[in-house]
């Protein structure tokens, strides 16, 4: 058996003291006594996660038995410069005079973010179905207002791509698996202040991912 993990800094293991040993991808792989590879990168968007994952799957000589896909904060985006260089934007890194600030202030709204996330979920699901690739997935977010009420941001009926994903039942990391940082501070690297999942949080994530894989 082989596993492929993809996502943002959560799957990468940010804020862990012993990242390679404590992150959930390692724990899950040890459970199945199998090899794995982790494609995750810090600060990337759902566009980047899906594109990077598909590119890697296309270039592998042997497909993994299961892909574990972690979708991320929906306001993150990527764009290409005139020189075909990929740039990633995150709301947290927007400077006072950055051009990306103009995008988030004048153009971006929650519907755009939701639509982009669901578009990527639809795209990856379609790719896996077309290529007989098994996968499990979950959605993670850093923003407390979304963590507490994800249905307000993710389960609305506005937009087109969400409706195309009517058969997709999302698993929310913080809401369904870890609890909020106020409810379960031990699951977070910064306790009640939140942050990335702690070592205990990654163990909890591993338990949930194992349940999803076993249910395939």
What are these regions (language model features)?
Residues 54-216:
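Alpha-helical cap/lid subdomain in secreted, periplasmic
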Residues 1-48, 52, 204:
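Serine-esterase "nucleophile elbow" of acetyl-processing enzymes
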């Amino acid at each position: 058996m082989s596993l492929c993990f993809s996502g943002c800094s959560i799957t990468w293991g940010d804020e862990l003291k012993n990242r390679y040993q404590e992150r959930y991808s390692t724990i899950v792989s040890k459970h199945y006594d199998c090899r794995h590879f982790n494609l995750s990168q810090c600060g990337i968007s759902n566009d980047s996660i899906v594109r990077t994952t598909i590119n890697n799957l296309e270039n592998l000589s042997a497909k993994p038995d299961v892909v574990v896909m972690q979708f991320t904060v929906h306001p993150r985006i990527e764009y290409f410069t005139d020189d075909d260089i990929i740039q990633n934007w995150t709301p947290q890194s927007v400077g006072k005079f950055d051009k990306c600030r103009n995008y988030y202030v004048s153009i971006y709204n929650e519907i755009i973010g939701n639509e982009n996330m669901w578009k990527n979920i639809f795209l990856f699901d379609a790719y896996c179905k077309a290529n007989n690739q098994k996968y499990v997935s979950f959605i993670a977010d850093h923003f407390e207002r979304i963590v507490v009420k994800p249905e307000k941001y993710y389960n609305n009926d506005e937009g087109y791509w969400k409706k195309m994903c009517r058969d997709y039942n999302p698993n929310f990391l913080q809401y369904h698996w870890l609890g909020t940082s106020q409810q379960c501070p031990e699951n977070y690297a910064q306790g009640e202040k939140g942050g990335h999942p702690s070592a205990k949080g990654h163990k909890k994530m591993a338990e949930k991912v194992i349940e999803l894989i076993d249910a395939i």
